């Protein structure tokens, strides 16, 4: 809120927006920060601390009126996660005129977008970001899948096993662009994988994994003799993920569907291996 407006105007509009969202969508998806930033960096830090304590991993900055462009964009700058901006449309009186001649927050949104650019802050702004409580609730709901994608990428590690095969250019991933997306990469030698695979020989969990594979394959189980090897390989990858995911919450495996040392592994490596466990995606080139 600007300090030339009553703070209660923004607070009431914020409450109406949150109530509109809860009435139409999943109430567990949204948290209402009680701090109203009134042209104050101190308020901004209080709001940042509050949403961190609440465990929020995405942020919507709502301009209840023109909005203080400095502190509101600082909040987006300091928040570590996907963020969006929306703004309040002016309520109208019964005769269609603006209540007490007040304007809406479109002007503040223009200033906010300019300040975000100056700060090199990437934020999602809807095509027309000014609306009623119900309209802004719809905008937030449309942002959720975007926020999930951004959050997932920034917490993802792709574990690959090489060398990358000759004549498969698509396998030679442009790592720089993955880094730009916030994705972490761990490239390993297939010899490392082979060593880990051998260490899982005779693993006591293999029979249980084989049973799971047999159940999924059903009548399609044409080569039951290779299932123990496949189970051994699956456990190798699952343990590798647990030992190597580091600070990341999500992991995907990128490998080749046939190993360079196929005679040593005693099998090829189909991409569906980990699908039966429901643990994580494992894809080939």
Roles of regions detected by a PLM:
Residues 248-285:
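Glycine-rich anion/phosphate-binding loop at the beta-strand->alpha-helix junction
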Residues 1-113, 117-151, 155-159, 164-254:
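Metallocofactor- and cofactor-centric catalytic cores in central/energy metabolism, strongly enriched
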């Amino acid at each position: 809120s600007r300090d030339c407006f009553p703070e209660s105007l923004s607070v009431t509009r914020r409450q109406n927006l949150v109530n509109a969202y809860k009435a139409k969508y999943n109430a567990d998806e949204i948290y209402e920060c009680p701090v109203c930033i009134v042209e104050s960096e101190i308020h901004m830090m209080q709001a940042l601390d509050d949403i961190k304590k609440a465990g929020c991993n995405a942020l919507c900055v709502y301009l209840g009126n023109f909005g203080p462009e400095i502190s509101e964009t600082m909040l987006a700058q300091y928040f570590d996660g996907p963020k969006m901006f929306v703004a309040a449309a002016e309520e109208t009186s019964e005769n269609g005129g603006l209540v007490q001649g007040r304007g809406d927050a479109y002007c503040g949104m223009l200033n906010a977008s300019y300040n975000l650019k100056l700060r090199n802050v990437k934020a999602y702004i809807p095509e027309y970001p000014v609306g009623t409580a119900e309209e802004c609730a719809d905008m937030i709901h449309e942002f959720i899948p975007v926020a999930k994608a951004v959050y997932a990428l920034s917490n993802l590690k792709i574990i690959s096993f090489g060398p990358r095969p000759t004549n498969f250019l698509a396998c030679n991933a442009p790592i720089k662009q993955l880094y730009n997306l916030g994705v972490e990469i761990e490239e390993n030698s297939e010899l490392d994988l082979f060593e880990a695979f051998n260490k899982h020989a005779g693993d006591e969990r293999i029979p249980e994994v084989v049973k799971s594979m047999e159940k999924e394959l059903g009548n399609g189980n044409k080569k039951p003799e290779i299932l123990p090897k496949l189970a051994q390989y699956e456990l190798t990858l699952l343990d590798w993920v647990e030992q190597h995911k580091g600070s990341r919450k999500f992991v995907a495996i990128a490998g080749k569907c046939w190993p360079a040392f196929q005679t040593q592994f005693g099998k090829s490596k189909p991409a569906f291996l980990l699908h039966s466990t429901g643990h994580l995606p494992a894809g080939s080139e």
